[in-house]
Amino acid sequence: RGLGDVYKRQMLRDVGLEDISDGRLYRENDMVKTDTNSCQGCKKICCIGMGRTIVLDPYDCYRLGIGTGKTFEQLLDTNIELNMVDGCILPNIKMQTVSNGCSFLGADNRCTIHNYRPGICRMFPLGRYWEDDEHFYYILQKGECNKDNLTKIKVRKWIGIDNIESYNSYVIQWHSYIKKVQRALAGLSEEQIKILNMYNLRTFYMKGYEADKFFEEFKERLDKSIEMFGM
C-alpha cells in the first residue's frame, strides 16, 4: 500500500508531489485513471506484505462490524490488531502469519470484505494530500497499482461511499481530532497517555453505533471529548 495520508509541509521538506504522484490534485467530481475493471487479468496480488499500514478509523470498524457481524473485540481476536501510531493506539488490519497477506484475503486471493472494505483500501491507488489538519485533496500515487490499462472514473464513484460529503466531513473531524491528541501527548505522563488512548478506543471504536446514525453519534461523542479535554 501507498502513503494513504501525506502532509503538504512534510512533502515540501522530504519529497515533491511529482515524486510520489502524477502531480495533480483531485476532488470528488474529477476524473482519475484508477478503474481496474475489478482487477481482471491482474497477476499481482497487492494485498500482501502491508505490515501495519492499513490503519482503521472508527467508520472503518463500524462498517467491518456490520459486514462481518463481529464486535470490535471479536475482530481483535481474528482480523485486526492494535498498534502505536505517533503516540496514539489505533487498530490496523492484521497480516496472515504464513502468507503475510491481509487477514481478509480469501483462498482465491480475492478480498472477502470488498463491499465494506476500509477507507485506505477504497481509495487505493489514490491517497489523501492534506494541506492542513482540515483540508485535503486526493492524489494518484505512482507505482502502487500493478494493473495495466487503467481507465478513467470519477473519484466519488471510485471511492464508492454513499453521501460522500458527510463521509468527508467525518474524515476531517477525526483526522483533526487525532492530530490534536498527538500534540497533547507531549505534555502528559505515561499513565495519562494510557488513559487517553483507552478512552479513545472505548468511545470511538468499542462502543456501538445505532444503524444509519454513525455520523451523528460520532459527532456527539467527538464534541463531548473535545470539550472534556479542552482541545
Where in the sequence are the language-model features?
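Short loop/turn segments that flank or connect secondary-structure elements
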Residues: 8-73, 77-231
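Short, small-residue-biased leader/transition segments that mark boundaries at the very start
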Residues: 1-7
